[in-house]
Amino acid sequence: MSATILDGKATKNTIFEELRPRVARLAEQGRTPGLATVLVGDDPASHSYVRAKHNDCAKVGINSIRKELPADASQSDVEAVVDELNADPACHGYIIQLPLPEQLDAGPLLERIAPEKDADGLHPISLGRLVLGEQAPLPCTPRGIIELLRRYDVPLAGARVAVVGRGITVGRPIGLLLTRRSENATVTLCHTGTKDLAEEVRRADIVVAAAGRPHLITADMVRPGAAVLDVGVTRTDSGLAGDVHPDVAEVAGFLSPNPGGIGPMTRAMLLSNVVEAAERAAS
């Protein structure tokens, strides 16, 4: 058996096509959505990530707002930019690109973002509202995972899901999303304290691997026909490696590879959050 590939790139392009008319309608009202990025320093990877986000904006018709500061920027310098974006009606959502230079404290800066402009969906208030079932921007990567599964008709209601990794970006929030009534999955959150990881994974209909450990999930751990999503990524001597061993493709029913799976979906959900924020502001 060879797994059906959950193609994040193709799905991202489809979502972009769906966003374009929504953006155009807002533009006709003089309310073109705007995504801002705050980039501090000269890290090549950060510049590449930010450039990709703004290229995505151009494809959909979203306005790009770029705020770039030197590597020696102070905490107050970045705070001033955050305050400016919070007050800018042309900005409907923004991100502070991480990592930041070592002299900066990321936590207070991220909390300073106006919750309604939290494009990543990871502001403490956004996560609190998610727990309460209230409207808020959703975390981009978990939202992208669920959207990808839905687009390929992978059943969620009643499914047993093993989430491997308990990070704030994916592991913890995806459990909140998957256990909403709209999804109705049963979630097991696995981590370094899990006694028998292989057994927990083997019971699952859906596996979300987000531990950041190369090839942690092997073929013998996966139930035949299960959906496996490789989210974690690690830089090794031979290049980037995901959490899922390539041999899993011969056992799984569905596989979201890394790269090409969840990364593009995260970018699509970032733009979706911004468009939805603009629509709320216009209503």
UniProtKB/Swiss-Prot annotation:
Pathway: One-carbon metabolism; tetrahydrofolate interconversion. InterPro entries: Aminoacid_DH-like_N_sf (IPR046346), NAD(P)-bd_dom_sf (IPR036291), THF_DH/CycHdrlase (IPR000672), THF_DH/CycHdrlase_cat_dom (IPR020630), THF_DH/CycHdrlase_NAD-bd_dom (IPR020631). It holds the Pfam family THF_DHG_CYH_C. Transmembrane segments: none annotated. Gene3D superfamilies: Leucine Dehydrogenase, chain A, domain 1 (3.40.50.10860), NAD(P)-binding Rossmann-like Domain (3.40.50.720). HAMAP family: THF_DHG_CYH. Belongs to the tetrahydrofolate dehydrogenase/cyclohydrolase family. Homodimer. This is Bifunctional protein FolD 2. It comes from Saccharopolyspora erythraea (strain ATCC 11635 / DSM 40517 / JCM 4748 / NBRC 13426 / NCIMB 8594 / NRRL 2338). The lineage of its organism: Bacteria, Bacillati, Actinomycetota, Actinomycetes, Pseudonocardiales. The gene is folD2.
